[in-house]
Design a protein with these regions (language model features):
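Extended, well-ordered protein cores
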Residues: 1-224, 233-238, 250-257
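Non-transmembrane, aqueous-exposed alpha-helical and coiled segments at domain scale
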Residues: 167-172, 181-182, 186, 193-218, ...
Length: 758
């Protein structure tokens, strides 16, 4: 009886044939819920009662479904998709997405989670039949933090092809498996697009047929490549075209007409900016001074392959992937770079393809399937292990624990945890046998080209032991950053074609011509974000009070769960204050991201992005060849979001994550006043120019001196922002008016600065 009631509830909500307006549907739903609740009183088992009530709540939280859509011949579709407002379900694990879409068919199950209406992230081919949502939730959590540097918030999708195991058992080759994965991928994307709004040529939002909506317009859906789907972007864009979706080939970035991450090497190059900063702050130039590296990955992969070619001073002594273990105890940087480059260009290469004559004495390539591996004296010395014979798992553990200068993650898997975490909590069963604790690592620096190489607690344990590390979200943000630039550029170019400012035939050549500039814009974000973390690290334990207040403020708003994010509670913070122990870089990275995300929301809902001064901010966001389309640019559908993203990043990068809320409280101003004051202060005192001059001193002066100069500029900027927000910004104020009022005096003061300040 109860199940029939649930089906009736679903039909009352979503069957188009039921007719009636929204109010009458809501009334019918209310009556059915009351009736079901009465029926539930008769359920004898507490467990059954709880399960049924959760199902009622689930149906109530569904906002759309394709269940009542049909194909051209009138048949029901062979797949079902439902869209759920996850935050309406009390029992879901944290963090709860804004929306999730579940897609089911006999041959595939998948889920797409996103944290806001404008969200982006990859779709992965999952091999975790029973807990792919857990996998995707962990990934989207990292994606949400990573996306602080771009316009959309985080999203992630994962699909499990259910017939794949049978194909493998039947002896199906790689091509047969790939074909089945593509079939599942197509169904998954169709399920997502079935219930997503569209935008017509007039700019009006249109809705899918036979879909009853219990929410507002929702037309923004973009996807990206991920594990197992690196070559699927053109397939996705073909499906987008079949649906007439407004984003066309901006739907899936990185296709044949787009910015290919592997060709650009953008993810690895971004991670390398982080690695270079770590070493630069240790006084070492890794582009010219040889340094030892161990890693996870192989040269055929995007992130590892590109990464291990970014310096000709690399001495890669050991690495492993899912097939082989590579050890070169004393590599020659020049010849080993040439060999890695050859392997990178070799299709589907593995470590077994490495020219053994190029490996130094005692080294070799060993299959992970071997029963045991005999170790040479050279291997024992470079990895600092005593055994003469070990199994592959022990050898891989030794590589992770090796006393190398850099440990670089470029492959799939979670290899480092904290002592208090269990392998089950980590959720990566395949690597349980080789996982180590963060405090045991002996590398000086960790570069996270890959996602989830360490747990957050593992990162913190490594940092507390003196290691230099950020987070995967900081280190490998360049891929998603590049994709976001591509989407926003394609939206602009589409508008330029529609307005007649650009010919359709010129589109693809224009996109290709901007590849290098897009790459440089993305890498600037990696440089700036890692610098922001370094400046906060320099603040030390003295910043703990303001950081604690910021976390309390976010927690009170329901925006931050410290336990979920691995941030210390008040008791642990008190202990750190007593010990003079500051937050670690991984913790600071999380605070930085939360500050940017929160500030973005505040700015985009304020009047600040509409200030005329920020028209040029928008123009500078795009590559130079697009400046001629400024009229279309100012009508860009995401204009305010792009400007708000730029401003939230600049404010937090230059002034710190706790600054925005402290400034608003102390100056008693709103967000718009703070933003205008910040931008005016930067321009009045020409602080951007000063900041860039300090950045130009990389490796020319000691890192400590460089940091001190940045801190001086930041202090001036914070003080002048406060003064302007408190004293000068009034209703109707503009950035240009503030600059005109105060810059002449500031320039005059600069001209005689030495004599005045002495």
């Amino acid at each position: 009886v109860e199940f029939r009631g649930l089906l009736a509830l679903f039909a009352a909500k979503f069957d188009p044939a039921a007719g009636g307006d929204a109010a009458s549907r809501e009334a019918a739903v209310g009556k059915l819920v009351a009736k079901i609740n009465d029926l539930l009183q008769e359920v004898k088992s507490l467990d059954h009662d709880r399960a049924l009530r959760r199902m009622v709540l689930l149906v109530q939280a569904i906002k759309r479904t394709n269940y009542y859509q049909t194909t051209a011949d009138g048949a029901h579709k062979a797949h079902i998709s439902i869209k759920i407002a996850s935050r309406e379900l009390a029992d879901l694990p944290l963090p709860k997405p804004f929306r999730e879409i579940f897609v089911w068919a006999p041959h595939i199950e998948g889920v797409h989670l996103r944290f806001g209406p404008v969200a982006r992230g990859g779709l992965r081919w999952s091999d975790r039949r029973d807990d792919f949502r857990t996998e995707v939730l962990g990934l989207v959590k990292a994606q949400q933090v990573k996306n602080a540097v771009i316009v959309p918030v985080g999203s992630k999708g994962g699909f499990f092809p259910k017939h794949l195991a049978a194909i493998v058992r039947a002896g199906g080759d790689r091509d047969a498996q790939q074909a089945e994965a593509i079939r599942a991928y197509r169904t998954f994307l169709s399920g997502l697009l079935d219930i997503t709004d569209n935008i017509d040529k007039s700019g009006a939002v249109t809705h899918p047929q036979n879909v009853v909506r219990f929410e507002g317009d929702d037309p923004y859906l973009v996807v990206a490549a991920d594990k197992g789907t690196a070559t699927f972007s053109d397939i996705a864009n073909g499906i987008s075209a079949d649906y007439g979706f407004w984003l066309d080939d901006a739907f899936a970035s990185g296709g044949s007409v787009g910015y290919d991450h592997k060709v650009m090497g953008i993810t690895a190059r971004g991670a390398w900016e982080a690695v270079k900063r770590h070493f630069r702050e240790m006084g070492k130039d890794i582009q010219s001074e040889p340094f030892t590296v161990v890693g996870v990955g192989d040269m055929s992969g995007d992130v590892f392959g590109n990464g291990m070619l970014l310096s000709k001073a690399i001495k890669l002594v050991a690495a492993f992937d899912h097939r082989d273990i590579f050890i070169d105890p004393n590599p020659d940087p020049a010849s080993s770079w040439v060999e890695r480059d050859r392997m990178f260009k070799l299709p589907r290469s593995s470590w077994q393809d490495y020219d053994k004559s190029k490996i130094s004495k005692g080294g070799g390539v060993f299959p992970r399937s071997a029963k045991s591996i005999e170790l040479s004296p050279e291997i024992k010395a470079v990895l600092d292990i005593q055994e003469d014979v070990v199994d592959p798992a022990t050898l891989m553990k030794a590589i992770l624990l090796a006393p190398a200068e850099l440990l670089y993650f470029g492959g799939i898997g979670t290899y480092v945890k904290a002592p208090h975490e269990t392998d089950a909590q980590v959720g990566d069963k395949a690597n349980d046998a080789i996982r180590v604790d963060g405090g045991e690592l002996r590398a000086k620096v960790i570069g996270e080209g890959a996602n989830l190489g360490l747990t957050q607690a593992g990162r913190i344990a490594f940092a507390m032991s003196g290691g230099r590390i950020n987070t995967d979200a900081i280190d490998n943000s360049a891929g998603v950053d590049s994709s976001d630039h591509e989407v926003n550029i394609k939206i602009l170019i589409g508008a330029a074609i529609a307005s007649g400012a650009l010919k359709t035939g010129d589109r693809n050549a224009l996109l290709a011509s901007m590849t290098d500039e897009v790459g440089l814009k993305v890498l600037a974000h990696n440089y700036d974000q890692t610098l922001a973390v370094s400046l906060q690290e320099d603040d030390g334990a003295g910043a703990l009070d303001s950081q604690q207040q910021f976390m309390l403020w976010l927690g009170a708003k329901g925006k931050l769960d410290r336990k979920v994010e691995g941030l210390p509670d008040d008791v642990k913070l008190a202990e750190r204050k007593l010990a003079g122990q500051a937050l670690t870089r991984p913790e600071l990275a999380v605070l930085t991201a939360y500050s940017k995300l929160e500030l973005f929301d505040d700015i985009v809902s304020s009047t600040a992005p509409d200030d005329p001064f920020f028209k040029q901010t928008l123009v500078r966001y795009f590559p130079a060849p697009l400046a001629k389309f400024e009229a279309d640019m100012q009508r860009h559908r995401l204009r305010r979001e792009i400007v708000s993203t730029i401003l939230s990043n600049e404010i937090v990068n230059m002034c710190g994550p706790t600054f925005p809320e402290r400034l608003r409280q102390s100056a008693r101003c709103d967000t718009a006043a703070m933003v205008l004051a910040f931008e005016a202060a930067r321009q009045i005192f020409r602080l951007d120019q000063a900041w860039d001059e300090v950045s130009a001193l990389d490796l020319k002066i000691p890192a400590e001196a460089q940091t001190a100069l940045y801190q001086e500029i930041s202090m001036v900027l914070r003080r002048q922002t406060f003064w302007l927000a408190r004293r000068a910004v009034r209703p109707g104020s503009t950035v240009e008016a503030l600059i005109a009022a105060y810059q002449p005096a500031a320039d005059a003061l600069r001209a005689v600065g030495g004599s005045v300040l002495s």
